[in-house]
From Swiss-Prot:
Belongs to the OXA1/ALB3/YidC family. Type 1 subfamily. Interacts with the Sec translocase complex via SecD. Specifically interacts with transmembrane segments of nascent integral membrane proteins during membrane integration. Keywords: Cell inner membrane, Cell membrane, Chaperone, Membrane, Protein transport, Transmembrane, Transmembrane helix, Transport. PANTHER family: CYTOCHROME C OXIDASE ASSEMBLY PROTEIN COX18, MITOCHONDRIAL, OXA1. This is Membrane protein insertase YidC. It holds the Pfam family YidC_periplas.
Length: 608
């Protein structure tokens, strides 16, 4: 076994193990269970003792949770319409909840008649998900003195929330406290909520403004995929936190209400909410505002909840106060979230799950996004990105392929060394190393081109899987979604026969793969033909099977990733051929293909 084949076999085996490990650690997404839904929610627990500058966990009034649990949902609750260029929905005047929101720019599937994506839905519907705001009562107040989830707010008849027209909700508790809430929205996905209260009661009162995001049960479309974070996401003074739904059930129990909660005190900048594959909702206090960020799970009601509780305010008679917060509820678009981060929301781009190799995934996606904007086709953008990556690593590739060409030139001398050494392997290895040193050849250089691909492969896979911009991103023809496996299949001759291809999650799809994985296998096979087949029978068999094993293994990967690998193989073949030729060795590709077929025929004849 010569050193060049050893290196190539080692590097390919490492790639093979990486893909096997990928399947082991990142199995296909599991179908999420459908938990029962209860029409209840819990309000956050107010702080009755903390000073305004530094909120603390504090003691809470038990009446808050008790009142919230009595929420009644009726079909004739008045609503205010939400209508912007990008979202539609409504606000319920019962509780003032933002609980009905749909994203106009996104559909559930590629079908033209597919419904648009629903992000928020009211209590009483399966998998209810909504935002709720209010005031937690402190000294001098009871739960009946502040607006709750059951409070019926007043608003101007026919009012519609648009980017140009905010809406205002009001409620008078009849005891001297008047509450108002102004809700506005921008052209994208950011709501601004200003909560105000005026004290005309003649006595001092204490209360704490809060915001809540509540989910009844786990999301219906929970993917349970290891490579993707789904659950709570938050930023606390520059530190990102991610909590899966199943981890929330392991929080320490709160003896006051039996729920399980985790409380973080944020001193200056932060946000918290729920994130999914492509959509997210987050509560965002004003920059510089201290608050408590709470992640909570109510096991009895199966409700997941995130709260933002601002410092308690003591309001003297005749005084007014207000609290400003924001609510992001929409698609995790890189450009949109980047603009919000630039506007002052610290670390908001980290709400996209860039993974452990963020130092690779972030710049790779930024370049891919720019290329897609310039070209207008994501598939072509992936091909262009592959060219740029190959240019970036070309110095290493050149050195590697030049070394491989030198190894070919040394083959006659290496054969003489083997003949002289005979069965003395130690002597042969020693003389080989002296030869490499004398000729300044690195026998391990052949590994570099393949090994360099591994971190790029991981990073690009992450980019294709988690970023919204790849969802339903078209290439050409049948390839209308590069984030999913190749939709074509041998089963129906790539659409030529009048029956459907096997479902992506069926066993048949593993056998009847699409055209892209086949092109991948062929490109790997042709790339092997730059060198003659190994003389060792075991090596030759491994090399013969390897392209086709990779073809079937990568058949279930996102088609965008397979497009990258095919392009990479074609560029690598061209580079290697030209570099080796420039160093005096011209690979006989067609001759190697012919000799391979002749050997196969000879072996079959011998067996007969």
């Amino acid at each position: 076994m010569d050193d060049q084949n050893k290196n190539l076999l080692l590097a390919t085996a490492l790639s093979f193990l990486v893909i096997l490990g990928w399947y082991f650690f990142f199995p296909p997404p599991e179908e999420a269970p459908q938990p029962a839904t209860e029409v209840t929610e819990t309000a956050p627990q107010g702080d009755t003792t903390a000073p305004a500058a530094a909120p603390s966990a504090g003691a809470a009034t038990a009446e808050v949770d008790a009142a919230a649990a009595e929420t009644e949902i009726t079909e004739d609750v008045p609503r205010l319409t939400i209508d912007t260029p990008r979202v539609e929905g409504s606000i319920s005047l019962k509780g003032g909840r933002i609980d009905d929101l749909r994203l106009k720019d996104y559909r559930e599937t590629l079908d033209d008649d597919s419904p648009i994506v629903t992000l928020l839905s009211p209590a009483g519907q399966p998998h209810a998900y909504y935002a709720l705001y209010g005031w937690a009562p402190g000294a001098g107040l009871g739960i009946e003195d502040v607006p709750t989830a059951n409070t019926l707010w007043q608003a101007e008849a026919g009012a519609t929330l648009t980017p140009d027209t905010p809406v205002t909700l009001t409620w008078d508790n009849g005891k001297g406290l008047t509450f108002s809430r102004e809700v506005s929205i921008d052209e994208d996905y950011m709501f601004s909520i200003t909560q105000s209260v005026t004290n005309s009661s003649g006595a001092s009162v204490a209360l704490a403004p809060y915001g809540t995001l509540a989910r009844h049960g786990e999301p219906a479309n929970l993917e349970n995929f290891f490579v993707l974070h789904e659950g709570v996401v938050g930023m606390a003074d520059g530190e990102l936190s991610e909590i899966d739904y199943d981890d929330m059930t392991d929080f320490d129990p709160d003896p006051r209400d039996g729920s399980r909660a985790q409380v973080n005190t944020v001193t200056e900048n932060g946000w918290i909410g729920f994130t999914g594959h492509y959509w997210m909702s987050t509560l965002i206090p004003a920059p510089g505002e201290a608050f408590r960020a709470i992640a909570k799970y109510d096991e009895r009601r199966d409700i997941y909840q995130t709260d933002v509780v601002l410092p308690t305010v003591t309001l003297a008679a005749g005084e007014s106060t207000s609290a400003n917060t924001q609510l992001f509820a929409g698609a995790k678009e890189w450009a949109t979230i980047r603009e919000y981060e630039r506007a002052g929301i610290e670390g908001f781009l980290d709400s996209i799950d860039w993974g452990w190799f963020f130092f690779f995934t972030k710049p790779i996606f930024a370049v891919l996004h720019w290329l897609n904007a310039a070209i207008g086709n994501m598939g072509v953008a992936i091909i262009a990105l592959t060219f740029l990556l190959k240019i970036l690593v070309f110095p290493l590739a050149y050195k590697s392929y030049a070394s491989m060409a030198r190894m070919k030139e040394l083959q006659p001398e290496m054969e003489k060394l083997r003949e002289r050494a005979g069965d003395d392997r130690q002597k042969m290895q020693k003389e080989m190393m002296e030869l490499y040193k004398r000729e300044k050849v690195n026998p391990a250089a052949g590994c570099l081109p393949i090994l360099i691909q591994i971190p790029i492969f991981f990073s690009l896979y992450k980019v294709i899987f988690v970023t919204l911009e790849l969802r339903h991103a078209a290439f050409f023809g049948p390839f209308q979604d590069l984030s999913v496996p190749d939709p074509t299949s041998l089963f129906n001759l790539f659409g030529l026969l009048p029956w459907a291809a096997p479902a992506p999650d069926s066993l048949l799809s593993l056998v009847f793969i699409g055209i892209l994985p086949i092109l991948l296998g062929v490109s790997m096979w042709v790339q092997q033909k730059l060198n003659p087949a190994p003389t060792d029978e075991t090596q030759r068999m491994i090399f013969a099977w390897m392209p086709w094993v990779f073809m079937f293994m990568l058949g279930g990967f996102a088609s965008g990733l397979v497009v990258y690998w095919i392009t990479n193989n074609v560029i690598t073949f061209t580079q290697q051929y030209l570099i080796m030729r420039s160093h005096g060795y011209t690979p006989d590709v067609f001759g190697n293909i012919k000799s391979g077929f002749k050997k196969d025929k000879a072996e079959k004849a011998e067996k007969k």
